[in-house]
A protein has these predicted regions:
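Structural motif corresponding to the C-terminal cap of alpha-helices
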Residues: 14-21, 175, 179
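Catalytic domains of cell-wall/extracellular-matrix polysaccharide-remodeling enzymes
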Residues: 16-67, 188-216
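Glycine-rich phosphate-binding "P-loop"
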Residues: 1-16
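N-terminal start-of-chain detector that recognizes signal peptides
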Residues: 2, 54-58, 160-163
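Active-site and substrate-binding clefts of carbohydrate-active enzymes
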Residues: 62-245
Length: 245
């Protein structure tokens, strides 16, 4: 891996963030959670205080992290904090088999009237050259591989609310269990690509809206927090050398 290439990419990312948000970023979600030992030096040079990586990047670190991925660790030599992605909450959302987006109530991404309807009917709405394209209008929900049932937005919205409650309940129980033996406030790091919400998972923004409201109004066990806020409240953390991720 060319360090200068990595340094240039990080520099561009920091510069772009500052141009958009008007301030320098405090941390970074490394592309595809990729980390190579020594990259934390480059991040520190860029003024970044923390980064997110996959669970094994923390779990396979040396020495082994006392709290697993449920507390950040500091990189030896630089002091840059490393947050490992939580496996359980990631699976609940990202898994193509067990994840929420695959529920039969949700809109089917791969069926679009640009390909489903008769060519003469759809011709005015597709590519000027006559090539069929996705129009964004989708009539079906995720049911079977061939015969699909019609999409019902009200049913999908109810399911999004239900699954937001399920996600919150699981995090509550997860936090209660972890705090019981950690005796330190654990953190559940749950990062998701923005393209999931509204693109692959059409109801994703609704689910996220329900989840945030439920966490704020419906319980008192967990709360939303950023990595920066967690580090300010919990500055004492283990020092390790993260593994390749």
């Amino acid at each position: 891996i060319c360090r200068e290439s990595v340094r240039a990419q990080v520099k561009v990312a920091v510069s772009h963030y500052e141009a958009v948000f008007g301030r320098k970023p405090r941390g970074i979600w490394l592309p595809e959670c990729g980390y190579h030992p020594g990259h934390d030096e480059i991040l520190k040079e860029a003024g970044l205080r923390y980064f997110l990586t996959d669970a094994h990047g923390v779990l396979h670190g040396a020495p082994r992290p006392k709290y697993g991925c449920f507390a950040p660790v500091y990189c030896r030599g630089t002091g840059v904090a490393c947050f490992g992605r939580d496996l359980d909450s990631s699976k609940q959302v990202w898994s193509s088999i067990d994840g929420y987006p695959g529920d039969y109530s949700y809109r089917e991404f791969y069926r679009d009237i640009g390909f489903d309807l008769d060519y003469d009917y759809i011709r005015p709405y597709i590519h000027p050259d006559g090539v069929r394209i996705n129009t964004g209008i989708k009539y079906y929900r995720i049911t079977g591989s061939d015969n699909k049932e019609s999409y019902n937005p009200h049913l999908a919205r109810e399911k999004a609310a239900q699954q937001a409650g399920n996600f919150m309940f699981n995090r509550e129980k997860q936090i209660e269990y972890l705090y019981g033996f950690m005796q330190k406030k654990p953190i559940i790091v749950s990062p998701y690509d923005a393209e999931l919400f509204g693109h692959w998972w059409y109801e994703g923004p609704q689910w996220l809206d329900f989840l945030i409201r439920k966490i704020i109004f419906d319980q008192k066990t967990i709360r939303l927090i950023t990595p920066t806020e967690y580090l300010l409240e919990n500055p004492r953390n283990q020092v390790i050398t993260p593994s390749l991720s």
